Amino acid sequence: MNINTTYLLTGAAGFLGINICTQLIERGEHIRAFVLKGDPARKYLPAEVEVFEGDLCSAEDCEAFFNIPEGSQSVCIHCASMVTIDPGYSEKLIAVNVGGTENMLAAAKHHPECRKFVYVSSTGAIPELPAGQPIREVNQFVPYEEEKVVGWYSRSKAMATQKVLDAAHAGLNACVVHPSG
């Protein structure tokens, strides 16, 4: 029996998301893309992509995003985040990056057909080390030292990363990647 897999992709209209869409389509995969309502970048998504409009800050939208045909399985790639170079605190930043990730994790846990959860974090979430010291894998992101995780974007990604690692330790098949720009 061949089980159909749907790739659930958040942040699909962003730079990384569109590139992931392109790669998956070239492999013949089915993609369900989570995009913000009215996002003008949606027009760049390949026509083969199934578009789901919603808000990561809505637990109901995240739950609905995971609803796929019975007998199918899914893989969630959570790329969406609010990005800023402003180092200051922002409630919206925390709501989207941390709260949105919590909503996605809750939905994934509620849907056993979700076989894998991949969270796209940031190298900014990794505590900075003195110059010349090699970066090593980190398995604890919270609590963080404010002088080593600089700016609230990086801190929000560190907090969300910890949520994913905690979910993985609790049994969710989840992993984290830390791309750099």
Which residue stretches match the model-derived regions?
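Rossmann-fold NAD(P)-dependent oxidoreductase module
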Residues: 19, 23, 107, 163
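SDR active-site strand-loop-helix element
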Residues: 10, 34, 76-80, 117-123, ...
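NAD(P)H-binding glycine-rich loop region in Rossmannoid oxidoreductase-like domains
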Residues: 45, 49-99, 103, 109
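Active-site Tyr-X1-5-Lys
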Residues: 147-178
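Conserved glycine-rich Rossmann-like NAD(P)H-binding loop of the short-chain dehydrogenase/reductase
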Residues: 29-38
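N-terminal Rossmann NAD(P)H-binding glycine-rich loop of SDR-like oxidoreductase domains
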Residues: 5-27
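Conserved Rossmann-fold NAD(P)-dependent oxidoreductase catalytic core, especially the SDR/UDP-sugar
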Residues: 102-152, 175
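Residues forming the Rossmann-fold NAD(P)(H) cofactor-binding site
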Residues: 17-18, 98, 158
